[in-house]
Amino acid sequence: MDRKRTKLELLFAFIINATAIYIALAIYDCVFRGKDFLSMHTFCFSALMSAICYFVGDNYYSISDKIKRRSYENSDSK
């Protein structure tokens, strides 16, 4: 239940998030704003957003694991 994710899993999740955000932003820039498809601004912003998702997701999973552990311990003590 409280399985630690390996560094390799976290790295792949970060790369997948950054790629998905980058593709979405690049399509938006190209279609709606008429900018270059492979701009550095889009790449940097997608890396930033992926980092935010990475840290928020890590905190979310650690908090949810603590809640599950407490509820499991409380049910055992009754």
From Swiss-Prot:
GO terms for biological process: bacteriocin immunity. It comes from the Bacteria. Keywords: Bacteriocin immunity, Plasmid. This protein is able to protect a cell, which harbors the plasmid ColV encoding colicin V, against colicin V. This is Colicin-V immunity protein. It comes from Escherichia coli. The lineage of its organism: Bacteria, Pseudomonadati, Pseudomonadota, Gammaproteobacteria, Enterobacterales. The gene is cvi.
